[in-house]
Amino acid sequence: AEEPRSDGPGRPSPPGPDDMAALIYTSGTTGNPKGVMLSHRNLVTNAQAVQQIFDVEPADKLLSVLPLAHTYECTIGFLVPLLSGASVTYLDGPPTPSRLLPVLERVRPTIMLSVPLIIEKIYRARVVPKLAKLPGFLRKFPPTRTLFHRLAAGKLKKTFGGRLRVFGIGGAPLGPDAERFLRDGKFPYTIG
């Protein structure tokens, strides 16, 4: 490890733009997760780039369910709200239904970030079983399926507090059935 720079005895110098600011882990999608050293310049540049395409306002309320050690959550779920003056509520453990549902009701987030697995679990547990109860010809008829998806997505929006305007999904590919549900249901999601 390098010795920190100093402005004199007992006074460290402020960090430079290329000094390491954080050790962030990859998701391990193509192998084991790896630690990536990010500089102050990396973090600020990423946050500023996100601000250009992702509108976060001081009135926004984010609910964080992903680990801050993941670059997606660190940048979009922590740094961007910090720079924008928005508030962030952190879940105090894994996003199990018993932990997540009361917090969603209390916080009523406007923005939430997720990995595909979370929304896919919700889709498989809450939507697929109800869709399966429809007769086969109705289930396969696109207008019926779209209407069903809209109704189910409306209920899901209420479950998420009724104010959700952006549900960001990243870190891995989203399954096509879950994405069709979100798209048909006009759920306010974005990928990336």
What residue spans do the PLM features occupy?
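Conserved AMP-binding A3 loop
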Residues: 21-47
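Conserved AMP-binding/adenylation subdomain of ANL enzymes
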Residues: 44-61, 68-153, 163, 184-185
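Short aromatic/basic micro-patch
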Residues: 14, 37, 113
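Conserved G/P- and acidic residue-centered "switch" motifs that form tight phosphate/ATP-binding loops
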Residues: 28-29, 85, 171
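Conserved AMP-binding/adenylate-forming
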Residues: 112, 148-192
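Conserved pre-ATP/AMP-binding loop-to-beta segment of ANL
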Residues: 6-25, 32, 55-61
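Conserved S/T- and glycine-rich ATP-binding loop of Class I adenylate-forming
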Residues: 20, 26-29, 62, 67, ...
